[in-house]
Amino acid sequence: AHKTGAAFEGGHIIHGAANAMYLPKVIKYNAKNEEAAKRYAEIADFIHLGGNTTEEKIDKLIELLRKMNDELNIPHCIKHYGEGGLPAEEGIVPEDEFLKKLPEIAANAILDACTGSNPRQPNQEEMEKLLKCCYYDTEVDF
């Protein structure tokens, strides 16, 4: 979220909204780490989300976060992030600008101090894929 806030000419992505949009994707990415997956499942248990398996619990946690975004009128992805942070069919970050700046944003995100505490350490390719998932609201399957 730190590296995308002011990266685009069309406008500023509010830091809290960026975190809200990215968190479901980041959880899915990090859940490939066994210890992180167990912790996410514990969170789901603590707030009584249900689910029988670790994966089901994580899915319910992600579902809750997406529902909260809907209730707070926060878009699910950068592509639909509109003026004032509101959902829009065409957001403030055009696809061509996003793709042009993607390698630089990904490289800067890898170097961000917060990334060092992440359960999985993404390389350039993974970070670009994760950011694309955050732009298009596509499934994290890597």
Where are these regions (language model features)?
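Oxyanion-binding "anion nests"
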Residues: 1
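Short, amphipathic C-terminal "tail helix"
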Residues: 96-142
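Gly/Pro-rich interdomain helix-loop hinge
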Residues: 4-97
